[in-house]
Amino acid sequence: MTAVLPLPLPLADPAPRTPRLQREPLRLAKRLRHAVGQAIADFGMIAPGDKVMVCLSGGKDSYTLLDMLLQLQRSAPVPFTLVAVNLDQKQPDFPADVLPTYLRAQQVPFDIIEQDTYSVVSRVIPQGKTMCSLCSRLRRGALYAYAQAHGVTKIALGHHRDDIVATFFMNLFHHARLAAMAPKLRSDDGAHVVIRPLAYVREADIAAYAQARHFPIIPCNLCGSQENLQRQQVGRMLQQWDREQPGRVDQIARALGDVRPEQLADRTLFDFPGLGGGADAPLPDAAGWLAGSAAEHARD
C-alpha cells in the first residue's frame, strides 16, 4: 500500500526545540518565497487577473509550489486566483482521499480529474520499459483540456532548479542538443502558457521544507519506482557533484541564463558566413568544397 504522511503542521513546531532550530524552518520558508517571487518577477510569470492552475501530484515539489503561491498571493503586487488540480490516473493503491482532505483543510479551491491513463500506459509500454514519456504526454493532454475548459490563463508546474539542470544534461547526453526547461513557455499548440515558479529553488530546500511542513506525500508507484532511468542517473551525477564540488550545479543553472550564441556552433542562431568580409559575394556550399576533396581522393 502507498505510504502517506500526516497533514501539515504549522511551521512553528510546538515540540521543544533550541532557538536556532525553531528559526530554521521560518528562514527556509522566507528563502523559498524570495526565490519564487524573484522567478515570477524575472520571467513575468503572473499578470493581473490571472487564473493560475497549480498541477498538484501529491509530491513534495507540487505541494511546495502551491504553498509558496498561497503565501505570495496574500501580498502579491497583482491580484490573481489559484486553483489546484490533480489528475487521478487510477494507479493501483492510489489514496484518492488524501489530496481532497488536505486541500479542504487549507481552504484551497480544487478539482480532481479522473482519467485512467495508468491502464493505457501499462497496456502500450512493454514490461520493464520506461513509462515516463507516454505517461507525461497523456497527463499533459488531460491538464491542457481542463485549462481550456475552465478559463485558466497560466499552468503552474513544480519543476525546480535541479529538474531544469538535469533536463539540460539529458538533452546533451541523449539527444545531442543544448536545451533545458524554460521557466515560462507557450505550449506547442499556442493555447496555453506554462510557468515554473520553482525555477530558482534547489531540490534539497524543497525536501527540507516538505519535511518541516509534514506534507502528506503520495509516492508515484508508476514511474518513480522504476530503476536505472536516465534521469535518475543524471540526478545521481548532480548529487555527486554537489557533494564533491559545492556550487557547481548552481553555476550550471546560472549559465542557462547567460547564453552566448556566437560562441557556439548553431548556424541558425549566428551568421558565421558573414564574418570576415566578403559577405556580399556568394560562398560555395559544402558540395563545392567536398567535390575538390573527392577529386584529390580519386587521384590518390
From Swiss-Prot:
One of its GO terms (cellular component) is cytosol. [4Fe-4S] cluster binds at C132, C135, C223. Its cofactor is Mg(2+); [4Fe-4S] cluster. Belongs to the TtcA family. This is tRNA-cytidine(32) 2-sulfurtransferase. The keyword Transferase applies. Its EC number is 2.8.1.-. GO terms for molecular function: 4 iron, 4 sulfur cluster binding; ATP binding; magnesium ion binding; sulfurtransferase activity; tRNA binding. Gene3D superfamilies: HUPs. PANTHER family: AMINOTRAN_5 DOMAIN-CONTAINING PROTEIN, SULFURTRANSFERASE-RELATED. Keywords: 4Fe-4S, ATP-binding, Cytoplasm, Iron, Iron-sulfur, Magnesium, Metal-binding, Nucleotide-binding, RNA-binding, Transferase, tRNA processing, tRNA-binding. GO terms for biological process: tRNA thio-modification. It comes from Xanthomonas campestris pv. campestris (strain ATCC 33913 / DSM 3586 / NCPPB 528 / LMG 568 / P 25). The thiolation reaction likely consists of two steps: a first activation step by ATP to form an adenylated intermediate of the target base of tRNA, and a second nucleophilic substitution step of the sulfur (S) atom supplied by the hydrosulfide attached to the Fe-S cluster. It comes from the Bacteria. Its main location: cytoplasm. Binds 1 [4Fe-4S] cluster per subunit. The cluster is chelated by three Cys residues, the fourth Fe has a free coordination site that may bind a sulfur atom transferred from the persulfide of IscS. It catalyses: cytidine(32) in tRNA + S-sulfanyl-L-cysteinyl-[cysteine desulfurase] + AH2 + ATP = 2-thiocytidine(32) in tRNA + L-cysteinyl-[cysteine desulfurase] + A + AMP + diphosphate + H(+). Catalyzes the ATP-dependent 2-thiolation of cytidine in position 32 of tRNA, to form 2-thiocytidine (s(2)C32). The sulfur atoms are provided by the cysteine/cysteine desulfurase (IscS) system.
